[in-house]
Amino acid sequence: MKKLPLVFSGCLLGLAGAGNLVLDTLPVLSHLLSLTGLSLWIYFLLLHLFNWKETKQELTKPPLLSGMATFPMAGMILSTYVFRVFPHLPLVAQGLWWFSFLLDLALIAGFTIKFACPGRRVHATPSWTVLYVGIAVAALTYPLVGIIEIAYATLSFGFLLTFYLYPLIYSDLKKHPLPLAMLGQEGIYCAPFSLLLASLVRVGGASLPTWVLIVMLLASQSFFFFVLTRLPNILKQGFQPAFSALTFPTITTATSLKMAQGILKHPFLDYLVLAETVICLIILLFVLGAYLNWLRKKV
């Protein structure tokens, strides 16, 4: 099998998230998506460890390094799948979670020192939100390790960085627009508020004020529909490996909507959940199929 590029880690997160999204409605599909995600996650890890010299060189590029946070994020979500399949082996699932969480922290620290400190800062791209806000996936999955303080800390960090990064990225992109090969990163715009909403629901549950849910839902959905309007422009450029950035943000948006609907219970939202689930699964399957075709041509 051809070496999977580093940006494919976005598809790993997409598979992991999709497996959780349809868990209660399509359990067989959920198992298939999660198992595929876990298998590819392990393969991806071993492949890049055995080719570490080449991988290390690729990680000197800021957009690639910041986007690599999708790998530990996928690991934290997949650890919940491991626990569902092997409930009698909680240490295995928890070990995967801690490995992924610590790797995410290491990526944040390493990237900040190299590319985000004053005097060294490169221009920001949407993948910065994956790196700095994506750590909030720890709040989404914290029940596996049972340390709610981690959930509070990562959720707070995610909120602060979201409101700091959006204006920064907008300002930098006005001066340095995304190159065509990275246009897929525009899909990331809907990820931060969606992840924060899902994590809020996980931590706060029914105790969350309704207005908080509605405000977060409006922000999440606004960015989701903005991303949908950008899809024609992204797709007409032809397939790029960065298309992986179209998968996990849309899946996260559908997941957050579904979790919020579990509390709001508004009839209209049921139809929206169904529509967004179908849309994000189509995007995931399309990108995976395009990747398969792309890899076949490169052999």
Predicted regions and their residues:
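Juxtamembrane helix-loop boundaries in multi-pass membrane proteins
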Residues: M1-G19, K53-T80, W97, I113-L140, ...
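N-terminal signal-anchor module of multipass membrane proteins
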Residues: M1-L46, L288
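Long, repeat-rich segments with strong aromatic
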Residues: V201, S207-G238, T252, M259
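C-terminal functional regions that serve as terminal interaction/effector modules
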Residues: G17, L35, L40-Y43, S220-L228, ...
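Hydrophobic, membrane-facing alpha-helical anchors
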Residues: L40-Q57, W98-C117, A136, F159-L173, ...
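Aromatic-anchored, glycine/proline-accented short structural segments
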Residues: F157-M216
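Helix-coil boundary and interhelical linker segments in multi-pass alpha-helical membrane proteins
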Residues: N20-L29, V82-V92, L140-A151, L200-V212, ...
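Structural signature of hydrophobic alpha-helical transmembrane segments
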Residues: L29-I42, P90-L105, I148-T162, T210-Q221, ...
